[in-house]
Amino acid sequence: MSDHTNPPSAPPDDDPNGGSLLMPVTLEEEMSRSYLDYAMSVIVSRALPDARDGLKPVHRRILYGMQESGYTADKPYRKSARINGDVMGKYHPHGDAAIYDALVRLAQPFSLRVPLIDGQGNFGSMDGDPAAAPRYTEARLARSASFLLNDIDRDTVDFQPNYDDSEMEPRVLPASYPNLLVNGADGIAVGMATKIPTHNPTEVIDATLAMIDNPDITLDELMTVIPGPDFPTGGLILGRSGIRSAFETGKGSITVRARTDFEEVRGGRQAIVISEIPYQVNKATLQERMAELVRAKQIEGISDIRDESDRSGVRVVIELKRDATPDVVLNHLFRFTQLQISYGINMLALDGGQPRLMGLRDVLSTFIRFREDVILRRARFELNKARDRAHLLVGLAIAVANIDEVIRLIRQSPDSTSARIALMERDWPAADVAPLLTLIDDGGNVLTEAQTVRLTEVQARGILELRLQRLTGLERDKIHNEMQEVAARIGELLEIIGSHIRRMEVMREELAVIRAELNSPRRSEINDSLADQDDESLIEPGQMVVTITRDGFIKRTPLDVFRQQHRGGRGRAAASMRGDDIVTRSFNAHTHQWVLFFSSGGKAYRQKVWRLPEAGPTAKGRALVNLLPELGSDGITAVLPLPQDESLWEGLHLVFATASGGIRRNRLSDFKNVRASGLIAMKLDEGDRLIGVATCREGDDIMLASRLGRCIRFQANEDTLRVFAGRESSGVRGMKLAQGDEVISLSVLRHVEATPEERAAYLRYASARRRSAAGEEDQIDAEVMEADDSEVTVDDTALSPERIAGLEEAEEFLLTVTIAGFGKRSSAYDYRVSGRGGQGIANINLAPRNGRAVAATFPVRPGDDVMLVTDAGRLIRVPADQVRITGRSTMGVTLFRVDKDEVVTSVFPVLETESVDDNGDDADSVAPAAPDGQVTDSDD
């Protein structure tokens, strides 16, 4: 039985001398070495381009293979399958698919700035469509490829054996222009990657010429010539900082944006037309992403997307809805789709066989050094060829000059060998060819002091092969002229070889020719002003009326849409209701204001007014759940427009009130960062709900009003209502409620230090003055108004003129509106300040006539307008100054004539509006307003 612990080993492989050929090695060492070999193979032989010609091995082999097979620009197209086979069989044994994919990319005008292959057939599209099979497509080298391959047969670059040593292939192509910059590169190696953008060929050549003229040229000077990448698909490049970083260090990131315009399409609608898309963006995928965002309602305002692209170029039309803001929709498309991309630049290339991160100056200087070496090697090759030709011409010239003697020697020789030897052993006069012999300088023809030379074997063979027609006088002149041309050419080549300056001149001349051939206008615009714009900067500022319905629909409507009417009118439609949906909340805000939304469940959300959907007065709006995620079944019961100037937020507090009479005060900064999904604003007891939120400062007065006509006023200070540190507290009791009652309004009032007697005296004086002005004064009013100038005494309380002026300046008025459309204005001095948690005092005298319930109570200022909205969706705008000022315990006057079973659901002030008198002639008015603008039924 074998030992499982030590199994028998395999017999060792022995060398002829009896020693073992097996070398023990650890697994770690072998894996490390093998992986390193693999990594270097991928880096050097597959993924990274060479900095000299800008090509990866597969691209280089395709171009060289097509050149060797004669598939040049001046020849007919050849089947791609044949090209595939030639390249795979001779140079690149890695599968036909890999070769064909690389060939296709070289032919795509949307992939390369200067395509190197001229393709015929379906070579793919910007929609990501694959190319047709290689048996269907044809190709040949493009004219631009010749500038990479020219002089490859003149010993300009080194060659190496192919994979099976059956062919020789170039290590690099003798590129005549910096193809690495012109066509860029993409590749992922092991542990590294390259991503080099394309550039404008004219600019790249100009930059190369600038560096030739001034090798110490700065990057800033270069960037005036080559300002940045130039993509074949065009587009806009935003800013230059990323470009400079990439040009300086080899790494950087640029923002590329599609080129778009606004057009008017059918029906007078606006459309966004895309004419250029960012580089390497799949157009079909881009449109699919847009459609997904529209279906998910992440982008609003798009009605249709269609692709009208054709051979003339890209054209994608995005039709917008009538209520959409084109700039905002476009900004959302930039933000959420590949209409705008961040293109990361990593200019990694092989320099001397080693990966190197290269900046713009590095790439250009590397190319210039390489190109100078190509020119030098070409000159040496051509010099050798010219000298060989000159060497032969010397022999022919000597033979022609001594033709009789040459013929005699040949005729006397028994055979060609003897004739050749006879020619080589004779001294020939060479005074006429002495200058050329000096240029040849090959040691074959040694000029003696007697100005004679002996012919070499090559020259002797050339003479023997000379045709008789070359012996004519004309042919002798041709030989002489050619000798002069070759001599001049040898002189030029010697100058090129011996002078760096001359080589730079040659390079400059050749680049000028290529520049004229590849001249192309810039396609990608570099825009310094189009930085990332936020949506808000695109929105025109203005006042909006925001309306929220019970079923959770919201809209914003420009304030000037609602024309002002006298109180007592019938109003106009504020929203088109469906079913039994009613308006539950409306408020006035600026488009650029932050608005805090508070749900009945105590959650807070934040949104800018301009982000709310805009709609006309009769439109219903859109569902709030599309704007406020995770709202659930809770309704929005409180909204709070915050000051537009965020510096005013300092020192502001938020006061929360619940239907059960609870209240809490927090710092506004606790709600400065509200996440998209909302956050807990107030912890509520079961069955309770949030009814209002307001901003206040330390020392302000808080007033709660109940549905059954009660109210309470107390001061917001540390003694009465402290600032809570947390958001999840349920707060403290603000008002004690009777059975069946609930808090319906929260107001913040200015705190004024005044005794009860001073408040009562001032109220009596102010009432008397108003009655006197209206011609309604009685005897008591007259007595009050006849007081001397030093002070006013009312009910034994003396008020100085200064005190009256101070109280008048600080006076606020509270408007209370019932569900039946009745309302009144009362001075805030009529509401005494008490402690928190009491039952409060009467706010209004309720009766069946005025509705038995309060809709709202809030402060108004002179000049304010007030809007009342009913559950039927009707709205009226009334100047607050037309509502008579009465005492606290009165029934009010008619503000809004409501129909039977119609109730007022929302009342809010409209500030700083222009008065537009509407006498009831508007088509949207249901009934005319009172002609004199006064109360139609006095219920005081």
Swiss-Prot record:
Substrates-to-products reaction catalysed: ATP-dependent breakage, passage and rejoining of double-stranded DNA
One Pfam family recorded for the sequence: DNA_gyraseA_C
Source organism, top-level taxon: Bacteria
Motif (GyrA-box): 565-571
Quaternary context: Heterotetramer, composed of two GyrA and two GyrB chains. In the heterotetramer, GyrA contains the active site tyrosine that forms a transient covalent intermediate with DNA, while GyrB binds cofactors and catalyzes ATP hydrolysis.
Biological role stated in the UniProt entry: A type II topoisomerase that negatively supercoils closed circular double-stranded (ds) DNA in an ATP-dependent manner to modulate DNA topology and maintain chromosomes in an underwound state. Negative supercoiling favors strand separation, and DNA replication, transcription, recombination and repair, all of which involve strand separation. Also able to catalyze the interconversion of other topological isomers of dsDNA rings, including catenanes and knotted rings. Type II topoisomerases break and join 2 DNA strands simultaneously in an ATP-dependent manner.
Name this polypeptide is given: DNA gyrase subunit A
Provenance organism: Granulibacter bethesdensis (strain ATCC BAA-1260 / CGDNIH1)
